[in-house]
From Swiss-Prot:
Histone deacetylase that catalyzes the deacetylation of lysine residues on the N-terminal part of the core histones (H2A, H2B, H3 and H4). Histone deacetylation gives a tag for epigenetic repression and plays an important role in transcriptional regulation, cell cycle progression and developmental events. Histone deacetylases act via the formation of large multiprotein complexes. Also functions as a deacetylase for non-histone proteins. Transmembrane segments: none annotated. GO terms for molecular function: histone deacetylase activity; histone deacetylase activity, hydrolytic mechanism; histone decrotonylase activity; protein lysine deacetylase activity. The keyword Hydrolase applies. The gene is hdac1-b. It comes from Xenopus laevis. Residues 401-416, 443-480 have a biased composition (Basic and acidic residues). Its EC number is 3.5.1.98, 3.5.1.-. This is Probable histone deacetylase 1-B.
Length: 480
């Protein structure tokens, strides 16, 4: 698979301004506020000018039950802090209570997280973007009928199911400090998804992710687990990540990538015990990007929230091939980043318990497993099911410019004019002003229109010919 450096990618980004309002409860380490901090930081770095920003739709219960059980989703829809006493048995059954508390707006929070990931997958499927980013997603512990590890709905599994409608093989990569157990479990018996997790192992949540857990049935050898010890640093992580992922890409040959960028693997995380810097963490994003595959980037863990915001802002810049200064711009949460007010963090002096011998031994065992794979398994593709999120981009172009658009339509629009507008003395910054662009389109000369009409007729004829050819090839393939 050809690698290439520095090719500019089209990036889209999903964010809803309400996501930072959800609150797991006093003393709970999971703070959705970190997503708002990330968003505010990347706005003040000016990164919004270089990507398309979308508000995610709220995923429906029907979308969620493409993976989760009906009764579990019905329970999540129904339970509230004021009616918990009526659901005590179900709370126990669905593991909701301590780690996964009931809080105000719980189901809406799940809808936004899932909506961004599923919509990202649809965008990638339609080749409308190269990279899609949803920092509200990445909730990798949720099971089919159970909440786990602060996660309720597994947006990753739902996004991968969407990608599988168009892609024969999808690779899932997890660099959160915790094992990506919910995603591995969902695809444990299939050869169409390979899950690769680099995580702390041994008396650590969730307790899964042993080197010997390799998948089952058709999925045997399609689960890859790299168990790690405390204190891994940038150098050691890069020394294992690059060769393992190179071998995975060579043997599995996926056509799409989902990268879970949990930031609890950073040095100084409140719940973590690794020693990665933001640059070391982001090297994984940089490397996966060189494979030039459609990529979905998701959030995940991360409990020292100032560092989560730093990390995901920097990784957004990496996705955009954009250099940003180490000096943090003034932003709404500036005081959180003291005393240094810098983007990058230093590693601590903790001991790296991952010796070179240990890492090499695990790596060689994984290579042996990967050699057991058939090169790029063949998959018989079925008719493509309907997309979970309907693409309404065509409707916008047909709107009457003199008519006021509906609230629903404006919500689907890229960004929000007030929040992302440039000041008058700023340059274009690579952003398209949709209204002006349409205005210019309307003032095309008649000659240009005629020329385009002729061109359209030719293209239509060409498309018909190609369609006939492809139909004939399909029929021949069927008969074989």
């Amino acid at each position: 698979m050809a690698l290439s450096q520095g090719t500019k990618k089209k990036v889209c980004y999903y964010y809803d301004g309400d996501v930072g309002n959800y609150y797991y409860g006093q003393g709970h380490p999971m703070k959705p506020h970190r997503i708002r901090m990330t968003h505010n930081l990347l706005l003040n770095y000016g990164l919004y000018r270089k990507m398309e920003i979308y508000r995610p739709h709220k995923a429906s219960a029907e979308e969620m039950t493409k993976y989760h059980s009906d009764d579990y989703i019905k329970f999540l829809r129904s339970i509230r802090p004021d009616n918990m006493s009526e659901y005590s048995k179900q709370m126990q059954r669905f593991n909701v209570g301590e780690d996964c508390p009931v809080f105000d707006g719980l189901f809406e929070f799940c809808q936004l997280s899932t909506g961004g990931s599923v919509a990202s997958a649809v965008k990638l499927n339609k080749q409308q973007t190269d990279i899609s980013v949803n920092w509200s997603g990445g909730l990798h512990h949720a099971k089919k009928s159970e909440a786990s590890g602060f996660c309720y709905v597994n947006d990753i599994v739902l996004a991968i199911l969407e990608l599988l409608k168009y892609h024969q093989r999808v690779v899932y990569i997890d660099i959160d400090i915790h094992h990506g157990d919910g995603v591995e479990e969902a695809f444990y018996t299939t050869d169409r998804v390979m899950s690769v997790s680099f995580h702390k192992y041994g008396e650590y949540f969730p307790g899964t992710g042993d080197l010997r857990d390799i998948g089952a049935g058709k999925g045997k050898y399609y689960a890859v687990n790299y168990p790690l010890r405390d204190g891994i640093d940038d150098e050691s992580y890069e020394a294992i990540f690059k060769p393992v992922m190179t071998k995975v890409m060579e043997m599995f040959q996926p056509s799409a990538v989902v990268l879970q960028c949990g930031a609890d693997s950073l040095s100084g995380d409140r719940l973590g015990c690794f020693n990665l810097t933001i640059k070391g963490h982001a090297k994984c994003v940089e490397f996966i990007k060189t494979f030039n595959l459609p990529m979905l980037m998701l959030g995940g863990g991360g409990y020292t929230i100032r560092n989560v915001a730093r990390c995901w802002t920097y990784e957004t810049a990496v996705a955009l091939d954009s250099e940003i200064p180490n000096e943090l711009p003034y932003n709404d949460y500036f005081e959180y980043f003291g005393p240094d007010f810098k983007l990058h963090i230093s590693p601590s002096n903790m001991t790296n318990q991952n010796t070179n011998e240990y890492l090499e031994k695990i790596k060689q065992r994984l290579f042996e497993n990967l050699r057991m794979l058939p090169h790029a398994p063949g998959v018989q593709m079925q008719a493509i099911p309907e997309d979970s999120v309907h693409d309404d981009s065509g409707e916008e172009d047909e709107e009457d410019p003199d008519k006021r658009i509906s609230i629903r339509s404006s919500d689907k629009r890229i960004a929000c004019d007030e929040e992302f507008s440039d000041s008058e003395d700023e340059g274009e910054g690579g952003r398209k002003n949709v209204a002006n662009f349409k205005k210019v389109k309307r003032v095309k000369t008649e000659e240009e229109k005629e020329g385009e009409d002729k061109k359209d007729v030719k293209e239509e004829e060409k498309a018909k010919d190609e369609k006939t050819d492809s139909k004939r090839v399909k029929e021949e393939t069927k008969s074989v």
